[in-house]
Amino acid sequence: LFDDVVARELKDEDRIVAKNKHWVAFVPYAARYPFEIHVAPVMPVADLAGLSPEQSDAFPEIALEVMRRLDGVFGIAMAYIATWHQAPVREGRDLLRLHWQITSVRRAPGKLKYLAGSESAMGAFIMDLKPEQSAGQLRDVVL
C-alpha cells in the first residue's frame, strides 16, 4: 500500500515538499497535523539495513532541507517529533516500507494543534489546512 502512496505522490506532485534522486518528502493526503511530513525512499526499501550506499548518502541532504523548510515556514525553530517506520523483522516484511515521519504540533506562529474530542476519542482528525496548502507553504520557504 505504501508503495502505491509514494507512487501517487510522485505522480501528483501537489503534496511534495522536497525530493532528490533517492528520496521524496511529502505531506500525506490524510495528514493528522498541518505540518506532518513523510520522507521515503523513491525505490522501496524494507528497513534501514536495506538502504543502498547511494540512498544512505542522499538522506542527509533531504533531511536537512525538510528541517530548514519546517523552521522557515514560521521563521522560528519548529518543534517536532520524528519517527522511523520499518518493516517487521521476520514475517510480513512486505507489509511496510521504510519511511521517516516528522510531525509538529505547531499549526501557526504561536499556536499549537490541540486535539479535539473527535480527534482524541475517535481518531477523526480535523485539519486547519489542506495537505496541498501545507506542502505549498513549505515549498515556498526560501532556503
Task: Identify what each model region corresponds to.
Residues L1-L143:
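HIT superfamily nucleotide-processing domains
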